[in-house]
């Protein structure tokens, strides 16, 4: 087995299980890809996988990352595609073996990190696009889902900027209103 994928508990305010609706069993690369395409959810998190070391290293080298590139966002999605295409035998286990605690203050939920998240998503997309001769339906699904995430981050970033502009205008308005009232107050004997 080159890659073992399993279900996980994901906790936030309530406990839930990440379900992919994939039958437990051993798959070859193509069969597993077809199962993922049916669910339309690659579930690319690395914490729900056990990977053979040589497959992991080959997948990482396949990305051909430059040393100056540092990625804190979407790195799981970046590595997931080469891992999947390099794994000949994949076993899917329906039993949850891991509990992931969602941190509300993490980089993915931090409004101040939106601009960095957008840039890192763009880097991940560009690195994935640079992989040669490996364009499969799974590749296009991952690119599609990453572009949707990127669009959401960009919309949140733009919304935040609009809210910030509105906030600044509101402060200025209140400031001038205060000055005007102070001016009128000083006119009254």
Give the role of each language-model region.
Residues 1-20:
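Conserved donor NDP-sugar-binding/catalytic core segment of glycosyltransferases
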Residues 27-112:
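Conserved nucleotide-sugar donor-binding catalytic segment
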Residues 75-76, 138-142:
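Short, conserved alpha-helical segments within structured domains
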């Amino acid at each position: 087995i080159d890659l073992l994928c399993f279900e996980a508990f994901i906790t936030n305010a309530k406990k839930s299980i990440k379900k992919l609706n994939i039958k437990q069993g051993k798959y070859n690369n193509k069969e597993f890809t077809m199962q993922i395409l049916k669910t339309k959810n690659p579930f690319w998190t690395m914490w729900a996988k056990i990977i053979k070391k040589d497959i992991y290293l080959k997948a990482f080298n396949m990305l051909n990352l430059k040393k100056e590139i540092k990625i804190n966002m979407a790195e799981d999605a970046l590595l997931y595609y080469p891992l999947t295409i390099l794994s000949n035998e994949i076993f899917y286990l329906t039993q949850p073996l891991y509990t992931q605690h969602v941190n509300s203050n993490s980089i993915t939920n931090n409004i101040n990190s939106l601009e960095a998240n957008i840039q890192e998503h763009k880097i991940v997309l560009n690195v994935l696009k640079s992989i040669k001769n490996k364009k499969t339906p799974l590749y296009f699904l991952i690119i599609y889902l990453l572009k949707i995430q990127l669009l959401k981050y960009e919309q949140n970033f733009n919304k935040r900027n609009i809210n910030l502009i509105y906030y600044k205008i509101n402060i200025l308005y209140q400031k001038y209103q205060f000055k005007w009232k102070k001016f009128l107050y000083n006119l009254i004997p």
